[in-house]
UniProtKB/Swiss-Prot annotation:
Reversibly catalyzes the transfer of the carbamoyl group from carbamoyl phosphate (CP) to the N(epsilon) atom of ornithine (ORN) to produce L-citrulline. It comes from Campylobacter jejuni subsp. doylei (strain ATCC BAA-1458 / RM4099 / 269.97). This is Ornithine carbamoyltransferase. It catalyses: carbamoyl phosphate + L-ornithine = L-citrulline + phosphate + H(+). SUPFAM superfamilies: Aspartate/ornithine carbamoyltransferase. Its EC number is 2.1.3.3. The lineage of its organism: Bacteria, Pseudomonadati, Campylobacterota, Epsilonproteobacteria, Campylobacterales. Gene3D superfamilies: Aspartate/ornithine carbamoyltransferase. The gene is arcB. L-ornithine binds at N156, D220, S224, M225. It is found in: Cytoplasm.
Amino acid sequence: MKHFLTLRDFSKEEILSLVNHASELKKEPKKLLQDKTLAMIFEKNSTRTRMAFELAITELGGKALFLSSNDLQLSRGEPVKDTARVIGAMVDFIMMRVNKHENLLEFARYSKAPVINALSELYHPTQVLGDLLTIKEWNKIQNGIAKVAFIGDSNNMCNSWLIAAAILGFEFSIAIPKNYEINPEIWDFAMKQALISGAKISLSHDKFKALKDKDVVITDTWVSMGEENEKERKIKEFEEFMIDEKAMSVANEDAILLHCLPAYRGYEVSEEIFEKHADVIFEEARNRLYVVKALLCFLDNQRGRK
């Protein structure tokens, strides 16, 4: 049985197939998961993730069950593996938005239903699928290659995009502050994948260097959930990494900006640049619905083969 915990577990062909199927489902909705059930476990609050998953399973003909931390005996000390065994035996899919990736891995180890990573501190793979669909729609993949820059924190979005770019053979540049680094194990994996795919990946501390000649610019919030006590320090460390008019002028003339939201204007992106690219950004958010539909169908098909 296949889970969706990180894009590392998926081939180039599988990733592109998910994006293409999402595009088809966007054009022609189908009830492909009649009477299937999705359990949604949230340790972290969400707007877009809950909307995307709940609507996806509903529009596919299934049902969603929302479970917060307070709804589960996990909050009272029940082992993760026991909760996984119970929920996994009752539903068809489990979506988890968690604080610790290790809990996600343990849940998947014991669940009889496929587990989907809807966000952990290490990865945010469903968001990257939505980004890829958006890039496809804006014709930013030419001859199988997209030229992408990620500017900001070396967080779960950066990790997931690094992996995707390495597998897909993209040109991908990262710019982060000097006292930040990419997870070494994830970086090593990406470098090995790049040798296979032909991806061109670079890392610097200069946003202008990373942005040069890029068609897609990606940024994210500097202060993730749970880091509120670090806000003042991080804002100071990241102040040179805002995406503003000067920054976008270094990218290609028709470059698009992506942001997984929520966006904090005046910090990671200027108000002017955000509004200039708002149509793309909010379509990016909407596209989460369609990639989740494709993902659920994929996992259902994989499970049916066993």
